[in-house]
């Protein structure tokens, strides 16, 4: 097979999903067994007769038992680039046990097989099953080397605890491009000891000196619980001496087989330096809320909407409706999800939330159990310039979704709000505050349950400052912040999405749910950490203040004092109770807004939002 053909086959197999890989390897396995039974027959009897039914039954039983065993061991789709000797041993035992079980069953009815025949069959089958897998690894490894990826890089591992031990268990596999020369750990008792065959050379502080002595090119952090300040210190040392710094995937992802310990390295990102650990919530009651049901997400192509779709799909709903206005973003999330979750029915729907009739038609057709309303305009300065669009999308759009939920008798609606809805000085925050009023207004009148979810800035979302900083750093700076005093609450996209899903499970009576996001972060500190992550210093990439933009606040709030309640639905999730306004009054106010334009509309919405926030 020439190089082009080899590359073609590798690329073809690499894009297969889990189910398709099972079929791919299953084809090789059954072919190996058929060939083994034929060869064994020829060697024992010296000729080929038409295959007796006995041998067909024996081969079929062996294949069924074998598939059950390797499926139990999780090997039916995983034998590829990251296989270990233990995986190959399991295949041998799987073939052996399956063959013996089939022999016992067949011998009771068809005493035609000798023990020598079965032994030969086991050896031939094991050889033929392992041959394509080992060949696959060798070809893939050689291809990596041909692409310049296979050069061994001298590497330090940071962490001699559980994470380091898990790393070492998978270190010696054929596609690794690492040459591990030492381990660093701050536990003095571990210095001089070995993890596997690799010595613990010293502490983190010894990194610059030891890296120079051992000519190290790369550092891998294998401590999932490492304090953010320690991450930052290690990163500063690596930047100073020109080392690349990576982290091992989360232990949970490695244990569950989502990512390999080797080859799944990630660069240290901003979430590692934020000063708090990512919040994970109790998911015990989400299965009954989602499993087997139809879920609809508006704004499904956006940063939050798409992550809600991913998180919801983990709980095996029957169907997920991906509703959005942008065809390209819906197309992308649709094709991502159908690859990852083949058993779920994903339905892409192009629709505008400003079109009530279209929404009602979709809701009545698919009968969702929960609607997650993520579609909204979120950019503060942009909405200051376009207040009419903020009104149409965030207020009218939310009203249409809530009204369609009521009319179609959808059991629950969860609306995504923002901390900018609290005491809003800008039109974006004000429209989201009015959207909260719409949700609570419908909750008072409808048989459906409505709730809202407030959270702060979402790291990595389209409206986040992170992509802006990344672009400015890539262009050589400067990095611009509006005011060095400005602070914001931050959370990750998965955190925000999990909160939204939990809100749906705990919603009862028009609540506003808020996640404990820790302390607010100075935007200036965030910018400094981003520069550090890029491998530069502030002398190379300066950070400058440009002044507060229209509609921005120095500080954000999550609740005003009148919205606080005493209870928590669960750890890290607080409940607020917003002032409720009769839906008839909201209808009247919306009609007034329809007649306004520009600055008049902006002032009216902001004034109304603040009046309702502080009303008794």
Residue ranges and their predicted role:
Residues 45-49, 139-257, 328-332, 339, ...:
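A solvent-exposed beta-alpha-beta segment
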Residues 280, 285-289, 441-457, 462-616:
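Strand-loop microenvironment adjacent to phosphate/nucleotide-handling motifs in alpha/beta enzyme folds
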